[in-house]
């Protein structure tokens, strides 16, 4: 297996109930029939990108109730889960109970299993890098009713691959307290 250092992909083993790509969304297009879209929980969306060191408007994976089970294929990448979420990370000989708002480093073959949201409906998975997605009307956000956005406007499916076009090499460990965190640009 040839591993390219700054690229990789996630293989979706279980897609989850309602798993899509979301960013800040499309605004000011409703007058021409393009519906609003974007992350449902703006604070957790922004915090996810901030924790992994991304620009705040980069697309993330949004999931509701039960999230995906993903296997990472690539060199190394940092991920974070935000929201009130129960998840596990499976490494070669180890299973870790995950903590939200804390980065974890995934390596070739590691799995992240997002079991369920707890006291929230939505949760977010951000990576230290960028998903390889198609922009439509200035956004990657998926609106499944209108079938617009990346992934042809559809939810993610079992067996699908999520390509990562760029992985940040800065893999420092970060952790924040949700209640004491400050984030700018919240509505």
Where are these regions (language model features)?
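Conserved "landmark" site that anchors the functional core of diverse proteins
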Residues: 1-187
């Amino acid at each position: 297996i040839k591993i390219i250092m700054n690229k990789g992909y996630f293989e979706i083993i279980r897609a989850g109930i309602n798993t899509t790509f979301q960013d800040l969304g499309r605004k000011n297009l409703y007058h021409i029939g393009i519906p609003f879209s974007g992350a449902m929980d703006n604070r957790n969306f922004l915090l996810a990108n901030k924790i992994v060191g991304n620009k705040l408007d980069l697309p993330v994976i949004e999931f509701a109730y039960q999230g995906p089970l993903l296997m990472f294929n690539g060199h190394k990448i940092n991920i974070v889960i935000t929201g009130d979420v129960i998840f596990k990370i499976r490494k070669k000989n180890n299973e870790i109970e995950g903590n939200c708002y804390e980065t974890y480093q995934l390596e070739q073959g590691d799995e992240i299993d997002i079991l369920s949201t707890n006291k929230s409906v939505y949760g977010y998975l951000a990576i230290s890098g960028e998903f390889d997605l198609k922009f439509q009307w200035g956004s990657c956000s998926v609106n499944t009713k209108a079938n617009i956005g990346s992934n042809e406007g559809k939810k993610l499916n079992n067996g699908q691959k999520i390509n990562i076009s760029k992985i940040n090499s800065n893999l420092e460990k970060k952790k924040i307290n949700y209640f004491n965190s400050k984030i700018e640009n919240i509505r």
